[in-house]
Amino acid sequence: MLTNGRLWVSVGVTSEQGPRADNQDFAAAYLGSETQRARQGLVAALADGVSGAKGGRMAAELAVSSLIDGYYAQGDTIGPAAAVERVMRAYNRWLAAMGRSEAMAHACSTFTAIVVRGRRAHVLHVGDSRAWLLRDGHLTQITADHTRSHPDQRHILLRALGLEEQLRLDHHEIALAEHDRLLLTSDGVHGPLSARRLGRLLGRRQSAEADAAALVEAALAAGGQDNATALVLDIVSLPSASHDAIAGDMARLPILPPPQVGDSVDGF
């Protein structure tokens, strides 16, 4: 398969209920068509519905599906981070309002997303799910948990989807290299497993699908008491640097207001 000059990835996702009564995690990736990948990139996201709240699974699944649907509806002239923030702020307002209803009382969810566009990855994050980068055998945690610092209160989220009407997403931008591995985990995976263990398992470099399954299996075998979800993205090939520069220039173009009656446009 020829992939030179194109964005190409391999993806693997595994999610297990574990000992919980139901699975409130949800993760998915949308690779799109070759044209979509060239213009807007690809999207992957993981969300973990807050346990004990009604509608936790629904909040998580709708967060991911809303991102995927809404991101590609934004068009390719807006930057990836701005597009994700626009979509998720609208979703957060809806979820916060629904959280006041009986059907979805206090529904909240963590949310961690990766947009790979050109030769760069954009990570948007709120909550305590995590994004990681494996490069040259070294695993780096990209995101920071939005939880209380006291060891006995680290399960308490300070920021999440639906928790407040105003959403604040952390944004990290990373220059990618071919053969990088990006990883998303719920706390049911990185809770029982140390970063060193995660790095060893991910560094075996089997298929993305096999390694996602191995991470979840190891977390549950280590005594994990939560839902466990892992999403692995292997960067197989990247477009040329010139493509990245053009995409960046387009994203920085100002969005002008629509013309009004009587305005002159290009001399007409």
Where are these regions (language model features)?
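PP2C/PPM-type serine/threonine phosphatase catalytic domain
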Residues: 1-268
